[in-house]
Amino acid sequence: MLAIIPSLALATEFKTPAITPERVAALQGTPEAMLVVDVRGAGEYKSGHVPGAVNIPHTKLTERLDQLRQAKGVVLYCIIGDRTLLAEQTLLESGLGNVYHLDGGLMGWRKAGLEVRTGWGP
Protein backbone atom coordinates (compact mmCIF):
# COMPACT_ATOMS: atom_id res chain seq x y z
CA MET A 1 0.00 0.00 0.00
CA LEU A 2 2.81 2.43 0.77
CA ALA A 3 4.28 1.92 -2.71
CA ILE A 4 1.04 3.13 -4.30
CA ILE A 5 0.60 6.29 -2.27
CA PRO A 6 3.87 8.03 -3.32
CA SER A 7 3.15 7.16 -6.96
CA LEU A 8 -0.27 8.77 -6.78
CA ALA A 9 1.18 11.81 -5.04
CA LEU A 10 3.67 12.29 -7.88
CA ALA A 11 0.92 12.12 -10.48
CA THR A 12 -0.69 15.26 -9.08
CA GLU A 13 2.38 17.47 -9.55
CA PHE A 14 2.35 17.93 -13.32
CA LYS A 15 4.04 20.99 -14.79
CA THR A 16 2.23 20.65 -18.12
CA PRO A 17 -1.41 21.46 -18.81
CA ALA A 18 -3.95 18.66 -18.69
CA ILE A 19 -5.98 17.83 -21.78
CA THR A 20 -9.16 15.80 -21.45
CA PRO A 21 -9.61 12.48 -23.20
CA GLU A 22 -12.65 13.90 -24.97
CA ARG A 23 -10.62 16.83 -26.35
CA VAL A 24 -7.83 14.54 -27.59
CA ALA A 25 -10.41 12.30 -29.28
CA ALA A 26 -12.10 15.31 -30.91
CA LEU A 27 -8.77 16.59 -32.30
CA GLN A 28 -7.72 13.26 -33.81
CA GLY A 29 -7.83 13.33 -37.59
CA THR A 30 -7.93 17.13 -37.74
CA PRO A 31 -5.16 19.61 -38.64
CA GLU A 32 -4.96 20.49 -34.93
CA ALA A 33 -4.22 16.89 -33.90
CA MET A 34 -1.29 16.44 -31.57
CA LEU A 35 1.09 13.50 -31.29
CA VAL A 36 -0.24 11.19 -28.58
CA VAL A 37 2.58 9.29 -26.87
CA ASP A 38 2.10 6.22 -24.70
CA VAL A 39 5.15 6.30 -22.42
CA ARG A 40 4.67 2.76 -21.05
CA GLY A 41 6.59 -0.32 -22.10
CA ALA A 42 5.85 -2.13 -25.36
CA GLY A 43 3.94 -4.97 -23.72
CA GLU A 44 1.61 -2.58 -21.93
CA TYR A 45 1.06 -0.62 -25.15
CA LYS A 46 0.18 -3.82 -27.00
CA SER A 47 -2.37 -4.79 -24.34
CA GLY A 48 -4.31 -1.53 -24.78
CA HIS A 49 -3.63 2.03 -25.95
CA VAL A 50 -5.27 5.21 -27.20
CA PRO A 51 -6.03 4.91 -30.94
CA GLY A 52 -3.39 6.74 -32.95
CA ALA A 53 -0.89 6.79 -30.10
CA VAL A 54 2.75 5.95 -30.69
CA ASN A 55 4.70 3.97 -28.13
CA ILE A 56 7.83 5.67 -26.85
CA PRO A 57 8.75 4.41 -23.37
CA HIS A 58 9.67 7.28 -21.06
CA THR A 59 13.24 5.98 -20.90
CA LYS A 60 13.62 6.37 -24.70
CA LEU A 61 12.16 9.85 -25.22
CA THR A 62 15.51 11.60 -25.66
CA GLU A 63 16.25 9.29 -28.60
CA ARG A 64 13.12 10.57 -30.38
CA LEU A 65 13.32 14.30 -29.65
CA ASP A 66 13.55 15.22 -33.35
CA GLN A 67 10.25 13.46 -34.05
CA LEU A 68 8.62 15.04 -31.01
CA ARG A 69 9.79 18.54 -31.94
CA GLN A 70 8.06 18.23 -35.33
CA ALA A 71 4.64 17.67 -33.74
CA LYS A 72 2.15 20.52 -33.19
CA GLY A 73 1.93 19.35 -29.62
CA VAL A 74 2.66 16.24 -27.61
CA VAL A 75 0.17 14.52 -25.31
CA LEU A 76 1.79 12.11 -22.85
CA TYR A 77 0.07 9.32 -20.99
CA CYS A 78 0.61 6.11 -19.04
CA ILE A 79 -1.91 4.22 -16.95
CA ILE A 80 -2.34 6.74 -14.10
CA GLY A 81 0.42 9.34 -14.39
CA ASP A 82 3.63 8.28 -12.64
CA ARG A 83 5.60 7.57 -15.83
CA THR A 84 3.92 10.50 -17.55
CA LEU A 85 5.41 12.74 -14.88
CA LEU A 86 8.90 11.35 -15.60
CA ALA A 87 8.36 11.79 -19.36
CA GLU A 88 7.12 15.33 -18.87
CA GLN A 89 10.23 16.21 -16.87
CA THR A 90 12.48 14.76 -19.59
CA LEU A 91 10.78 16.73 -22.36
CA LEU A 92 10.66 20.00 -20.44
CA GLU A 93 14.35 19.70 -19.54
CA SER A 94 15.05 19.12 -23.25
CA GLY A 95 13.37 22.41 -24.08
CA LEU A 96 10.33 20.90 -25.79
CA GLY A 97 7.25 23.14 -25.71
CA ASN A 98 3.60 22.34 -26.31
CA VAL A 99 3.63 19.33 -23.99
CA TYR A 100 0.39 18.18 -22.35
CA HIS A 101 -0.61 15.26 -20.17
CA LEU A 102 -3.73 13.20 -20.73
CA ASP A 103 -6.05 13.90 -17.82
CA GLY A 104 -6.50 10.62 -15.94
CA GLY A 105 -4.10 8.71 -18.20
CA LEU A 106 -5.36 5.58 -19.92
CA MET A 107 -7.71 4.96 -17.00
CA GLY A 108 -9.31 8.35 -17.67
CA TRP A 109 -9.59 7.52 -21.37
CA ARG A 110 -11.40 4.27 -20.54
CA LYS A 111 -13.59 5.98 -17.95
CA ALA A 112 -14.69 8.44 -20.65
CA GLY A 113 -15.95 5.45 -22.66
CA LEU A 114 -13.51 5.99 -25.53
CA GLU A 115 -12.12 3.23 -27.74
CA VAL A 116 -8.98 1.41 -26.63
CA ARG A 117 -6.99 -0.46 -29.27
CA THR A 118 -4.82 -3.52 -28.79
CA GLY A 119 -1.86 -4.78 -30.79
CA TRP A 120 1.13 -2.95 -32.21
CA GLY A 121 -0.43 -0.48 -34.63
CA PRO A 122 -1.62 2.98 -33.68
For each predicted feature, which ranges?
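Rhodanese-like catalytic fold shared by cysteine-dependent sulfurtransferases
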Residues: L2-L35, A42-G73, D82-P122
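Metallo-beta-lactamase
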Residues: Y77-C78
